[in-house]
């Protein structure tokens, strides 16, 4: 049975990603910083007959991430956990958000996936197969870049750069690495006014996590179509 690891899997898009991958026959490791919330999510998914286990994972904690290297198999990795650190400030312009807030965003949104990939990619290389999906945002798209929310925008833009770096380094392997803009999704982060349900937001992510051999790598996708960086 293939194994999928999803960070931030206890709610929102992450929870739906776990559900959809489980429905496709994956044994899902649901990463959650909060064990109680993680176990609650696992219980709900197991109630649907899915093979899901809770994995305590704080993507801002290097020691927590280091334990991932002990895993025996990971076929699909979805770097989904993220924070919108700018929301701690009333004025979210780049001239007012402190550098410390930007660093907080990078710690979770960029360095978290970076460290996770350092642990998981060797596992994928040993087994000769892997799919990595970095959940990004349209707010990181340089072609459409606007102002405000610098911690979120900059950290997610750097995550896209990580996708390109890894895809290049792994181009002669069967490990595919892509970024995705899930769209504006109704989650705690996206808010209740968002246009997409979590099921819709997860669809392209799951598609990228299950690409066939020879599929695209090093791309930025939305609605299963490649978009400009």
How would you label these PLM feature ranges?
Residues 6-7, 79-80, 131-137, 176-181:
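Structural signature of the Rossmann-like NAD(P)-dependent dehydrogenase/reductase core
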Residues 1-29:
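Canonical Rossmann dinucleotide-binding motif of NAD(H)/NADP(H)-dependent dehydrogenases/reductases
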Residues 172-173, 179-182, 191-229:
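C-terminal helical subdomain
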Residues 24-40:
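Conserved glycine-rich Rossmann-like NAD(P)H-binding loop of the short-chain dehydrogenase/reductase
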Residues 35, 55-67, 99:
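The beta1-alpha1 cofactor-binding region of Rossmann-like NAD(H)/NADP(H)-dependent oxidoreductases
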Residues 87, 143-144, 181-193:
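Short beta-loop-alpha junction of Rossmann-like oxidoreductase domains
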Residues 83-87, 91-106, 114, 118, ...:
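Catalytic loop of short-chain dehydrogenase/reductase
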